[in-house]
Amino acid sequence: MESQQLSQHSPISHGSACASVTSKEVHTNQDPLDVSASKTEECEKASTKANSQQTTTPASSAVPENPHHASPQPASVPPPQNGPYPQQCMMTQNQANPSGWSFYGHPSMIPYTPYQMSPMYFPPGPQSQFPQYPSSVGTPLSTPSPESGNTFTDSSSADSDMTSTKKYVRPPPMLTSPNDFPNWVKTYIKFLQNSNLGGIIPTVNGKPVRQITDDELTFLYNTFQIFAPSQFLPTWVKDILSVDYTDIMKILSKSIEKMQSDTQEANDIVTLANLQYNGSTPADAFETKVTNIIDRLNNNGIHINNKVACQLIMRGLSGEYKFLRYTRHRHLNMTVAELFLDIHAIYEEQQGSRNSKPNYRRNPSDEKNDSRSYTNTTKPKVIARNPQKTNNSKSKTARAHNVSTSNNSPSTDNDSISKSTTEPIQLNNKHDLHLGQKLTESTVNHTNHSDDELPGHLLLDSGASRTLIRSAHHIHSASSNPDINVVDAQKRNIPINAIGDLQFHFQDNTKTSIKVLHTPNIAYDLLSLNELAAVDITACFTKNVLERSDGTVLAPIVKYGDFYWVSKKYLLPSNISVPTINNVHTSESTRKYPYPFIHRMLAHANAQTIRYSLKNNTITYFNESDVDWSSAIDYQCPDCLIGKSTKHRHIKGSRLKYQNSYEPFQYLHTDIFGPVHNLPNSAPSYFISFTDETTKFRWVYPLHDRREDSILDVFTTILAFIKNQFQASVLVIQMDRGSEYTNRTLHKFLEKNGITPCYTTTADSRAHGVAERLNRTLLDDCRTQLQCSGLPNHLWFSAIEFSTIVRNSLASPKSKKSARQHAGLAGLDISTLLPFGQPVIVNDHNPNSKIHPRGIPGYALHPSRNSYGYIIYLPSLKKTVDTTNYVILQGKESRLDQFNYDALTFDEDLNRLTASYHSFIASNEIQESNDLNIESDHDFQSDIELHPEQPRNVLSKAVSPTDSTPPSTHTEDSKRVSKTNIRAPREVDPNISESNILPSKKRSSTPQISNIESTGSGGMHKLNVPLLAPMSQSNTHESSHASKSKDFRHSDSYSENETNHTNVPISSTGGTNNKTVPQISDQETEKRIIHRSPSIDASPPENNSSHNIVPIKTPTTVSEQNTEESIIADLPLPDLPPESPTEFPDPFKELPPINSRQTNSSLGGIGDSNAYTTINSKKRSLEDNETEIKVSRDTWNTKNMRSLEPPRSKKRIHLIAAVKAVKSIKPIRTTLRYDEAITYNKDIKEKEKYIEAYHKEVNQLLKMKTWDTDEYYDRKEIDPKRVINSMFIFNKKRDGTHKARFVARGDIQHPDTYDSGMQSNTVHHYALMTSLSLALDNNYYITQLDISSAYLYADIKEELYIRPPPHLGMNDKLIRLKKSLYGLKQSGANWYETIKSYLIQQCGMEEVRGWSCVFKNSQVTICLFVDDMVLFSKNLNSNKRIIEKLKMQYDTKIINLGESDEEIQYDILGLEIKYQRGKYMKLGMENSLTEKIPKLNVPLNPKGRKLSAPGQPGLYIDQDELEIDEDEYKEKVHEMQKLIGLASYVGYKFRFDLLYYINTLAQHILFPSRQVLDMTYELIQFMWDTRDKQLIWHKHKTSSDKNI
């Protein structure tokens, strides 16, 4: 206090002032804004020591001119000394007026040196002209603290400025980082307040209390510049200073505004975290307070969910509300509203209880000595509000409280309470027993527990499932060492010594008994409310009594402390003494739980499971010995029989004992399979199978339907066949209960023939296993054969029949014999069998013309049932024939998609198997055939093979016509030539066009190398085919080449740019397509004949004869042929529907392509350049038996089987029908597949760009974690409908960039894998045009953005799998899809919901009602088109803020920021926009039309007179029927589709003057007459002439038609 008196009554110097501020009260008023108060204690001591040696001089009392401040007198300043003062600068202000300090004068007149202005400088002298700051922190003794309502402004500073008392000011610290500026401003404002400048600090509304003077402004500027270096200022502060470098007040105003906002949020969070409620205030007020805080935080972007809010509320509950912590913590989905419902209920109950309870006042002395807060607590309150809940609830384990005991309890035992007392009793402490009640029990208490809070009483516990006491005095019928597991609330085991009964004798003279456990290891004697409820006794805490359900009061309840108690005087004592409690004889009369009761209680579990669970203590409360298991074995629960009814267990081999007495073909199994959908009417949809029980011989018959007559015909046939062929009679036929077997017609037939029908029982398919397993085996074989051969689906039954023939010939591992051997038949002659789908050439014995070819390509199916011939499918004639006149095509093996068999052929094996049939062809027939071929210029097939040591010029030596050297006499070099499996061409999508994006009708691409072959019946095609002779390699090189990927085996030899070759024209007179055949003279034709007999010369011939030698050039080096780009080697062809990129002449084009159901990377029918060899035709004496399959021409065209063209037919097109069918046209494909963009792309530069785009897309997929890379799934384990096919597509964008995209085949996606109700929205064109118009009228900035791989940001909810990309090389695996891949049905909707949610929640946007994908707030409008965004705003900074938020979540690329005031060009959704803000906007498509129209292959007139109108007015279209070839019709429809599609796109974008003509012609797309085509060409010509026209908008001007 001495220091305080000194500062108030005696004048002191600056130095002594520093030393005098040592009072402890200074620290109690410490300002919270001062963060370095604790660091100045050493400075106090040092300054006190230094100033104690100085003399004190009285301060001047002169009053300055400024009425608000007092100026100090100038004093001499000693030289600066920094030695003894290493602390921060402590400057003491002499008076409150800063204008007198020369240090803070005009910026250009500041007399200081750098070391004097350092924050570490401390002026030791008392006459320093610089202000000194004391080491102590806080409000000075002579200055009142700021008001609590305004932290930053001292409202009394204006009055205190007049005082002459000295003030001790501490400077703010130096600003060292822009992030520390908010905290630094707080210290700077405190510095101003301590400098008596609190009145100039802006308040919350931005205005100071008083006007600032010039001197104060100078002081403000200089101090701010000193302590806040410009390089550490935030950007917004620099922006303010850039406008006015002295505008410190604006900086302070904005800082205070920011701090107020942050302070409010911080205060709300602190308030919410420190909530306290005990019912002292109304519950409504508490709820309003909490909900307002939560709403305010949510509005400020701080989201408080229900779980966090409830936890914060419950943590602050006390008193009677405290139990909600325990009852509500198990509710996972609890809401704030539900919690407040409970709080309101307790509050209302509390208010009612206070009105009904007598008021017992405590003695003041008791309140002073007892600091416990006695309030209602936890679990007993639950019973009071909901008694029924306790009656019906049981805990899995018995729990007991383990509450720490109190040592303040007296040793007196007095629990005698008046029986007539029914009023609630409230005991605040043990001294409140002054109502005539005694705390001593009248009975003998053998154990004195002095630690009980209320001795002689039982604690009522709603959480305990068992009653526990520590004394055995009240236990009746006790049994020792019970096997009971009891745990407390902390999961700790409580050892139990005995179990018995606890008997009560209540005040209504009724007796009740409950079970009780004895243990000395608990703090209180616990009375379980659950066990009381089991005997119809409940605790009413509103009346504080125990009562029955009829309202009879049994005993009062005493509340002491936080718990409720019942006196032990109602317990009946037992006759057992305490010392012998562990020796009590075990009572065998203890009643056990009946097993049916336990069975029902434990959810009807079986006895074995229940017994095992009790034995291992997984179920507590009772043990295995407590259950009566005597009836468990024989007990039959009727509910289990009904609810758990199952089928009987099928015993394996049980049927065999019933068939032991049957002979072969007496017991048959039969079953029907089908239907197979999407087949032509001529193909069967069902088949019926029969299996003999004894021999396991199998028969299959095709069915077109399941009618009674059809089934009866089959039964008649099979029975007659068995009777006549095997001399056996069928006795029993086993079948299922299908309607085709249970009908009356078949039943009568079987009854008439004495056959017993044996039906399976209901839903017992396993009893019909023989027939079921046969059907499954045959279908597996069918799918495999169709997949291997590539044949179309309508031949499925042929595959079934082929499999049946083979299966009957294979031995069974069980019987060691085949079915044919059991039936007494000979084994299958494999020399008569061909692989299913083997390509063959069939002789046409009845051609339409003598000059037409007589060989028809076909595919072998199976041996004939009715002849010695073979059933062969002829795609060109759309039928099957039974014939022996066929020739096997060597090298044309079945297509094996999944394996690389390119280096393998089965020609030698097939020759060896069929060698026995070679003798059927006489030599004179061969000679006669050769002579005929020479005379008619017919060319038989020859082998063109290469010499391994001559890669440059390989010449094929001609052989004389009489040479009949068989294929087996070939040299070793010929055997070394690798032969490639020639596979059936795959099905090609009919909607894919080859000329959809290029100007010419035929796409320019590298041609595929065809295998040269002609049939034995003659006919030569004049085809100009570039034949490439591949290199013959050594064995080592050949094996290495075979290990390469099959997808790239032709890539190097197909390129015209990399290979030199000679065109080898192969003439033919039987071809029908002569459009591209060059004119060749007869002499040249004779010279180029390749004779039939094959021969390989070991060395190049010395003399090259011009009439029998074909020169072939090959690449110069072996490495040049086999070299592949390293990057392409890692890019195998994906599983895509292959299509030949170019239609080129193929001499083996007669071999028809076969439709396949699955995709494959191999291009069907393409192999190495080895030619095919023929085998001598197999002749039989039997006539051909032709079975025609009637397939409609539409089906033929849909399958797109390009082979020998059938006779061209005319198609009649009706105008009205064509106009009505316009909507059914499918869109044109505008993208490239992998093989088109990379594999067969001969444009090297374009190919490299597509490869780069491919790798970029793969890296993006991995970056976005599109699929789960941790686990790969087997294709067989996944539901097929959840497997999505994928592919890579390539295209070139409008800006010239090449793009690759990995997409899913959504067109074949199963409907169960997506929600059809979800929609992907894009901005409507009119919405975009409206936004552009508003932007022009309001001088908006237009910013264009693009989000890369937008769909991949959206998660996918469904469980979907895709095949891995081709570069992973795992064709047999699947990966789990995690992101919305492009192409999926739901991807667009998922992305729209994702970006919509982000724009609304994070960017503060709202979707415009009526226009989806248009979002708006007060400053910015956004138009969303999938991954493109167009932003409109008045202020460009608003657009930038949105961009920054988007970049935080998405890979956002700015296409055009739009910040220039000059003309800016945009390309928005195909529109070329030129925009100058505030002046005009021009919309056009000149660049796009200049690029696209020439590619349409339309005859343009670029230099002629321009058209003045898009069409001739008043012209009517002729309605005569259009008669046109089908191929020509498709070509013209395809052309119309491209032309009208482009015109419609342009018209609806901005060329509205063309829409009438466009819509009229669009109705005639399917009626491509010459007149319609001419009108369409005229429209395109007009668009070409006016491509530079633009739609021009001027600001505040309406557009006129002249602008178009």
UniProtKB/Swiss-Prot annotation:
Keyword Nuclease: yes
Listed Polar residues bias regions: 1-23, 48-60, 127-152, 1005-1015, 1054-1082, 1101-1111
Compositional bias of kind Low complexity: 153-165, 402-418, 960-969
A Gene Ontology cellular-component term: nucleus
Record-listed E.C. numbers: 3.4.23.-, 2.7.7.49, 2.7.7.7, 3.1.26.4
Keyword terms of this UniProt record: Aspartyl protease, ATP-binding, Cytoplasm, DNA integration, DNA recombination, DNA-binding, DNA-directed DNA polymerase, Endonuclease, Hydrolase, Magnesium, Metal-binding, Multifunctional enzyme, Nuclease, Nucleotide-binding, Nucleotidyltransferase, Nucleus, Phosphoprotein, Protease, RNA-binding, RNA-directed DNA polymerase, Transferase, Transposable element, Transposition, Viral release from host cell, Virion maturation, Zinc, Zinc-finger
Region of interest called Disordered, as start-end residue ranges on this chain: 1-93, 126-174, 352-421, 956-1087, 1092-1111, 1130-1187
Residues carrying Phosphoserine: 416
Location in the cell: Cytoplasm; Nucleus
Residues binding Mg(2+) 1, per UniProt: 671, 736
Pfam families for this protein: rve, RVT_2, TYA
Region (Integrase-type zinc finger-like): 583-640
GO molecular function: aspartic-type endopeptidase activity; ATP binding; DNA binding; DNA-directed DNA polymerase activity; RNA binding; RNA-directed DNA polymerase activity; RNA-DNA hybrid ribonuclease activity; zinc ion binding
Motif extent (Bipartite nuclear localization signal): 1178-1212
Any one GO biological process: DNA recombination
Listed Basic and acidic residues bias regions: 1038-1053
Primary residence: cytoplasm
Post-translational modification: Initially, virus-like particles (VLPs) are composed of the structural unprocessed proteins Gag and Gag-Pol, and also contain the host initiator methionine tRNA (tRNA(i)-Met) which serves as a primer for minus-strand DNA synthesis, and a dimer of genomic Ty RNA. Processing of the polyproteins occurs within the particle and proceeds by an ordered pathway, called maturation. First, the protease (PR) is released by autocatalytic cleavage of the Gag-Pol polyprotein yielding capsid protein p45 and a Pol-p154 precursor protein.
Domain of life: Eukaryota
Binding of Mg(2+) 2, residues: 1346, 1427-1428
Domain Reverse transcriptase Ty1/copia-type: 1338-1476
UniProt-annotated stretches for the region RNA-binding: 299-401
Its biological purpose: Capsid protein (CA) is the structural component of the virus-like particle (VLP), forming the shell that encapsulates the retrotransposons dimeric RNA genome. The particles are assembled from trimer-clustered units and there are holes in the capsid shells that allow for the diffusion of macromolecules. CA also has nucleocapsid-like chaperone activity, promoting primer tRNA(i)-Met annealing to the multipartite primer-binding site (PBS), dimerization of Ty1 RNA and initiation of reverse transcription.
Domain notes: The C-terminal RNA-binding region of CA is sufficient for all its nucleocapsid-like chaperone activities.
Summary of subunit composition and partner proteins: The capsid protein forms a homotrimer, from which the VLPs are assembled. The protease is a homodimer, whose active site consists of two apposed aspartic acid residues.
Protein name (record): Transposon Ty1-DR4 Gag-Pol polyprotein
Gene this protein is translated from: TY1B-DR4
